[in-house]
Curated annotation (Swiss-Prot):
Region Disordered, residue ranges: 1-31, 146-199
Location within or outside the cell: Nucleus, Nucleolus
Protein species of origin: Rattus norvegicus
Disulfide bond annotation, renumbered to this chain: none
Main location per the UniProt record: nucleus
GO biological process: rRNA processing; tRNA 5'-leader removal
Protein name: Ribonuclease P protein subunit p25
Keyword rRNA processing: yes
Keyword Chloroplast: no
Lineage per the UniProt record: Eukaryota, Metazoa, Chordata, Craniata, Vertebrata
């Protein structure tokens, strides 16, 4: 593929075998009409997504939000959902994982110019259909059915405003390790002394 460059990437239309039905319904077909759908992409900024999501969930009319992403955006999708769960306590979560079809269009690169040759053929293109993992995370203020697959109850642990207990012990361990590292670096190495004497 070194002689090709990617021109565009688009989501292929969902077939009958797709788990979630039509692409508009997503994996959560029984959502209320007022639910917010956040489509996370590889180039999305987390702070922009969370600013909109937090403002939307602050409204009393909004009861649920769905973060969805596919391919390389799945890690960013999980990050957004976890940060929002920390900011807003008491959110119920359902996670769905599936595969989506993505069509990539590649165009051949023109060969290097040779003296006396004119380009006669237009660039050839190649279409590739890939199955990529897709993740959808539903966060709801209302209680969800705990028997459905992928359900997580609200987190009852303390939020970010309370003082951490485990982190302090890790910090103290890290400080002692950092102190040992600086003490070791301050001692001159025997080879370095020999080089200084010969120079």
């Amino acid at each position: 593929m070194e002689n090709f460059r990617k021109v565009r990437s688009e989501e292929a239309p969902a077939g009958d075998g797709d788990e979630g039905g039509s692409p508009s319904s997503g994996p959560f077909a029984d959502l209320a009409p007022g639910a917010v759908h956040m489509r996370v992409k590889e180039g999305s900024k987390i702070r922009n997504l969370l600013a909109f999501a937090t403002a939307s969930m602050a409204q009393p009319a909004t009861r649920a939000i769905v973060f969805s992403g596919c391919g390389r955006a799945t890690t960013k999708t999980v990050t957004c959902a976890e940060i929002l769960k920390r900011r807003l306590a008491g959110l119920h979560q359902v996670t769905r994982l599936r595969y989506r079809s993505v069509r990539e269009v590649w165009q051949s690169l023109p060969p290097g110019p040779t003296p006396g040759q004119t380009p006669s053929d237009p660039a050839a293109s190649l279409s590739v259909l890939k199955n990529v993992p897709s993740l959808a995370i539903l966060l709801s203020k209302d209680a969800l059915d705990p028997r459905q697959l992928g359900y997580q109850p609200p987190n009852l642990s303390p939020g970010p405003s309370s003082p951490p207990t485990v982190s302090t012990s890790k910090r103290s361990l890290g400080e002692s390790a950092a102190g040992e590292g600086t003490a070791k670096r301050s001692q001159p190495e025997p080879e370095a002394e020999n080089e200084d004497r010969t120079a």
